């Protein structure tokens, strides 16, 4: 190990230590927040020292205690991921082996058939701890409510005892809801360093957003109902509902936020989400209304508690917006006989992504507003100039695309305008640690495994490392779906040498058809039309929005935007808010909240735009020209012959997963599954058996 690598390892350990300290400190704050010790001692002391500042006033306490640590944590996460990105394959896998040996059991499925879906031991542990935090907070608040509120104290406010307690219970429930809201946006920040630093992807984290979303709406709805009952008992329902206090909680703003939240919540019902995806998709833009009026409701001082996650989400969302403004070069499309198309885009060689990554695609000629996620089937290492996605016709949007490209008039289409966001995926993968890799798919669930196979083909010849034996178990409804197997290898980039290092076996099952003749099956698979396009000069190769050092650039955006934000707030507070307010909370809450939100928006927009333009000027003009001049490498026959010779097709039956998976030999067998819910549950159940200690389960799901 060289001096540079040793220094990098030391820096890596220091960053991990700092991140752990910040995380533990934040957890302690959340645990102590509902206690009297926090309110009467800690908070009082902090407000005495910071709350009277002429530069920040009362919001300065929450700005320092809640917002600053999370922005710093995200910043350190970016630095950690940048260092990790340059780790060699052998270094990475040696480290992974040690970690997996210790914590492999925590990744095993624990809950399989339940409302939460497939949940691992680790997820159950963290879910239990989070629910314990909510119950701890609620219990502390309720105890203080029932102890401190007496008949005498209630009478001074003109309330009965039950009314006074109901009033405080409603407040406490709302405060507990803020805990859930504080974590709500982290899982949907697709390019977040916080997700990548702990090995999570945006797709795998969606379920956490769903869980938190349900909790947020259950708690906030209960909060609102308690107040409605209280106001009705006081004969003040209408007047209180329309009340917008200048220097206190705004009831009307809270109701608007709640209605926006309820509209989003209703559309998440599975039948509505699947059958009326457009309704679900468009209604979720109400998150802007929800968060805006939530801040107006509670005031900026209290809103800073759950705001860090939203801040990180805003940075990510605006970067995605900048990327989506460009049309990308769609080079060609392959139309398969199974109502499936493969779109091939030109890619900047500096854009690197891991297998199983996803990309969001927008085609304005089909829908100007709809964005749909698709798994990337190409390998950024094997195909440095091309990025490919496979799209199965399963909804209105994808059906329109297939009809457009498969119709007889498709020859008249010279260009298709496409915009993309992404790719998004794991910061690294650890498939090489396994002795063998078993991939189980159903239908279009084969797509993430195509990218894995291609990546391992490349690594087998270039890194000269041992590649796990691969077994692909794929189930299809019809024989025409077998044409998806022809996409396992790309049309260019492979050489004969690569095939000699790979051991792969494919077991394909056609469930709805009996055995057909070899001639008919081959005929169905060979009907693949290729459509070439002529992109405009303005169309660009898909490129990383923040350049080759994207994590460093994101760290710069997070740090600079936050520093500029606190400087702007300090100036405005010192020369505008403080002369009026004098730390007496007399300044209108809505105006102060608006100042903070506008300042955040301005800093995020300016720093993100500046970073994007700087990277575009420095890297892309030169590399775009390079991409256009690259000549394709035609695939040799041996790799394709290997796939054909390794494929075993079974007609009229489903894969017997118990027979195929139970008793697999080897100290480490990776089991990956992507397909229908029942298939994923079946595989998870097999891997959860006590006798399956050598099976390491991972589920890849398209369904939210």
UniProtKB/Swiss-Prot annotation:
Record topological domains on the Lumenal side: 37-62, 140-207, 308-329, 574-592
Organism field: Arabidopsis thaliana
Keyword Lipid biosynthesis appears in the UniProt entry: no
Protein's UniProt keywords contain Cytoplasm: no
SUPFAM superfamilies referenced in this protein's UniProt entry, alphabetically: Ferredoxin reductase-like, C-terminal NADP-linked domain, Riboflavin synthase domain-like
Protein's gene: FRO1
Residues that bind FAD: 372-375
Tissues where this protein is expressed: Expressed in siliques. Detected in roots.
Residues bound to heme: 209, 223, 284, 297
Membrane topology: Multi-pass membrane protein
Name of the protein in question: Probable ferric reduction oxidase 1
Cofactor: FAD
Family in the record: Belongs to the ferric reductase (FRE) family.
